[in-house]
Structures are given as structure tokens and as C-alpha cells.
């Protein structure tokens, strides 16, 4: 079991501990549960889906990286496929506060970058901030997304985001988590190709500035993040954050990164290079390359 889970695991009910122990035994537990695993946990504990998601939140929150606030938030995004995806907030010392990742963004990106097609619900241990409510409104599940909070009845996103402004107001038809392929040819080595593939999946209807980041760890594992724009602009999630979300949730740490590649267009209206390289350097990675999409 990864050390970060030990404290939260010890506080779970005995029957949930017994059912989870073989799942969490792998140090690189992928911070997700398949539909089959969810069904097995429900049978072992007698909990329904909502109660099980709440019971698992401490494990999601244990994935948080909060050196600034020490305020850990966990989220679980429930995919329409039946898979549940953990998420947690992340802060980066030496970067800017704008680089911060919220737990809801983490769980949603985890699902999206894992190939999930849509979300049915999201469970969070604290009320989503306005930033996250706006981020969720970019999803193809839209205002119908169910939000579950401890001690409250479940409500749709529309109940938390009154008079919402979103992609439909800007006549955007392709939404976050819809399948997208911008068709750039995969060239270069495996890491460069992973970055280009991530750029091809970008959701960037507002700036038309595709970008993707791929991180290579010392053991050869590659994590890729795609750019995810938002109708309100500021809740946009950069591609580096997507890659860092996966790296963190899959049990890796920043010192494990040995090389990074950013793929973007040289003449794009928005450029990721400066922010990406600055944040990576703050995390200790200085081997950073840029591949131009053409």
C-alpha cells in the first residue's frame, strides 16, 4: 500500500478495509475503481453507491498535495462506464497560485484523460468553489451533473450554478469529454508522440490553441495531459496540470520526472511554454523540450 493511504485506511470500517486491502496492496494503485470493483465493495459492505463514495473520500483526499494550505480536498468522479476516478487538490511551491489544481478538476481530468466519455456524478468532501462549478459546466454532462456532498441531499450542478454562463452561450457544440482528434501527425520519439497525441485531444474551442504535455518518469512510465479550456477562461486547466494530476494519482512524485515534452503550435494565440517550463523547473525538472505542431 502506498504510504499516503495508511492513515485514512486505518479509519475505515473493518469490512471496507478487508474488501479494499487487496485493491490497495499495489504501491501504484491507480486511484480508480472499476465498475466490477465498485460492485464488489458494495456487496462486501452493504453500502449503496452514494454511501460507498462518501466512505472512500478520505482515500481520495489522501492524494492531495497541499504544502501551502494543508487543506486536503478529495473528490470521486463517477463515470457513465461505471468506473470511479479519485481526485485531489494540488499546490506547487515555487510556482504561482494560478497553477493550483482543485480536487474536482483533478477527478474530472483523471476520468477524461483515462478515456471516460461522460460523468454521472461527482462526490466531494467540501462544497465546490465557484471556480470548480464553472469548470464542471464545460462538461458534456452540463448542468445535469449530480453533486454529492456530506450531510446534504444530492443536487444537480444547475442548483449550485444559478443563471449559469457556459459554452452554449458561445454556441460551442463540442464539450469537454466529447471525443476530439485534431489530427496532428505523431512524430519524434515516444515522449514527443505522447505529447502530440495529448494535444490532439485538447478541448480548446475558444483560442484554437491545442497543446499537450507528456512527462517521462525514471522507470519509463509516461503521463500525458491535454489542454482543457473553459468558457469563462480562468477555470481553464493547462496541459501540464493534466499530466501532473495523473502522475500524482498513480503514486509517483515530482522527483520521478526525468524529462518533459510540450507540444503546441508556434503561432497559436496562446502559448504554454513559459508557464509550463517555469512550473516544471519549480518542481525540479529542467529537461524540458518543445515540439511544434504542424
UniProtKB/Swiss-Prot annotation:
Protein name: Cytidine deaminase
Family classification: Belongs to the cytidine and deoxycytidylate deaminase family.
Residue pairs linked by disulfide bridges in the UniProt entry: none
Gene that encodes it: cdd
InterPro entries: APOBEC/CMP_deaminase_Zn-bd, CMP_dCMP_dom, Cyd/dCyd_deaminase_Zn-bd, Cyt/Deoxycyt_deaminase, Cyt_deam_dimer, Cytidine_deaminase-like, Cytidine_deaminase_bacteria
GO MF terms held by the record: cytidine deaminase activity; identical protein binding; zinc ion binding
UniProt cross-references to SUPFAM superfamilies, sorted A to Z: Cytidine deaminase-like (SSF53927)
Annotated cofactor note: Binds 1 zinc ion.
Any single GO CC term annotated in Swiss-Prot or TrEMBL for this entry: cytosol
Catalytic site positions: 104
Organism encoding this protein: Escherichia coli O157:H7
